[in-house]
């Protein structure tokens, strides 16, 4: 798939912008704070209906405007799909093929993107929350069912935590409702964990040969979804549910004492190992960057495997963060397969072959010129 055109209205520092993308590779050049990252973010928001930079949608709306609008035409094997996302202070509304989607979970998936920005290099050494968000965003692109299950889990988790607080402060003494909420939470949690386990195994399958190639065959990358559950069969929801039930029974008194849910997918993590050693703890900066790069490149093949189309790759000021060898490996891997957008302050660091086939855009103070 690829984006044929993009229109922005009142989006961040863009009053209005219209762009045509005819090339597989599109390079956006400009000084810092001119709007390069805002453009990349707009493509990502059109795809995911949320920003990778902020959870406050109001920041996406241009100063003194009531709404922002992003429109794009996505070309796929079976035809073109117009997309539109309107962001207002009341919320977001998305259209696919001119049809308004009732839920944003139904909107997500029409356009698949992979964002690789400097902060993604923290995927390995950052907090578990960063890695959980990575899993949720990437699985959500290829599974609307997962987004529904995750949303349901988060809703029940919030209700359960509220009830635990009431039990803790003795505003409630009847525990019957806690058991009901626990059963509901377990059902949603089992589905979330099963999908995360499946995704982690798929990601490892695609990331291993990429990591081996970058490390010249000297390193083997393995991934482990870290949960306190005893998961012998990740596809058996009843076994996962039983394991949760057992754990919640043991933790009930402690949870009431603390007033919070102590167990579940919201506490899980993904661990990365190179040659059997935890990369986060023992890996060099180079190994951590190679791991992050391998995971991002693996997503390309994973999404292609799931939906039969290659996603769009957004490289936001990340090439300058990679050494020449990793940069060359990245560009060689995607060449000819994936529509790619690259932001940079200078083309000096981009190889000649990539520039030769690229469409070039210059951005200055929210204005784009091809």
Curated annotation (Swiss-Prot):
Gene3D superfamilies tied to this protein: P-loop containing nucleotide triphosphate hydrolases, RecF/RecN/SMC, N-terminal domain
Family named by the database record: Belongs to the RecF family.
Keywords, in A-Z order: ATP-binding, Cytoplasm, DNA damage, DNA repair, DNA replication, DNA-binding, Nucleotide-binding, SOS response
Subcellular location, principal: cytoplasm
Protein's UniProt name: DNA replication and repair protein RecF
PROSITE patterns: RECF_1, RECF_2
Pfam families: SMC_N
Subcellular location field: Cytoplasm
Functional summary from the UniProt entry: The RecF protein is involved in DNA metabolism; it is required for DNA replication and normal SOS inducibility. RecF binds preferentially to single-stranded, linear DNA. It also seems to bind ATP.
Binding site for ATP: 30-37
GO BP of this protein: DNA replication; DNA synthesis involved in DNA repair; double-strand break repair; SOS response
Single GO term (MF): single-stranded DNA binding
GO terms for cellular component: cytoplasm
InterPro entries: DNA-binding_RecF, DNA-binding_RecF_CS, P-loop_NTPase, RecF/RecN/SMC_N, RecF_2
């Amino acid at each position: 798939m690829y984006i044929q055109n993009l229109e922005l209205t009142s989006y961040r520092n863009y009053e209005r912008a219209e762009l045509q993308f005819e090339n597989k590779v599109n390079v956006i050049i400009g000084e810092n704070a001119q709007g390069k990252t805002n453009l990349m973010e707009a493509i990502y928001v059109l795809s995911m209906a949320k920003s990778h930079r902020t959870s406050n949608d109001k920041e996406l709306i241009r100063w003194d405007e009531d709404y922002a609008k992003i429109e794009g035409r996505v070309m796929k094997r079976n035809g073109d799909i117009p997309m539109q996302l309107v962001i207002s202070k009341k919320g977001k509304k998305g259209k696919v093929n001119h049809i308004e989607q009732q839920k944003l979970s139904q909107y997500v998936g029409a356009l698949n993107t992979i964002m690789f920005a400097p902060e993604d290099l923290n995927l390995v050494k950052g907090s578990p929350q960063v890695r959980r968000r990575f899993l949720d965003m990437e699985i959500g692109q290829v599974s609307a069912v997962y987004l529904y299950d995750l949303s349901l889990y988060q809703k029940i988790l919030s209700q359960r935590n509220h009830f635990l607080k009431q039990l803790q402060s003795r505003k409630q003494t009847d525990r019957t409702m806690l058991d009901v909420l626990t059963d509901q939470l377990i059902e949603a949690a089992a589905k979330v964990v099963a999908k995360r386990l499946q995704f982690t195994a798929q990601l490892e399958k695609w990331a291993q040969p990429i990591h081996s190639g970058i490390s010249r065959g000297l390193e083997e990358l393995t991934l482990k979804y870290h949960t306190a559950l005893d998961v012998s069969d990740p596809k058996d929801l009843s076994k996962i549910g039983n394991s949760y039930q057992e754990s919640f029974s043991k933790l009930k008194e402690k949870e009431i004492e603390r007033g919070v849910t102590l167990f579940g997918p919201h506490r899980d993590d993904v661990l990365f190992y190179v040659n059997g050693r935890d990369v986060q703890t023992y890996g060099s900066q180079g190994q951590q960057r190679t791991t992050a790069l391998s995971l991002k490149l693996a997503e390309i093949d994973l999404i292609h495997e799931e939906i039969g189309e290659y996603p769009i790759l957004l490289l936001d000021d990340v090439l300058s963060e990679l050494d020449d060898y990793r940069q060359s490996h990245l560009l060689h891997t995607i060449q000819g397969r994936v529509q790619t957008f690259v932001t940079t302050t200078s083309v000096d660091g981009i190889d000649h072959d990539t520039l030769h086939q690229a469409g070039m855009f210059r951005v200055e103070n929210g204005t784009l010129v091809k």
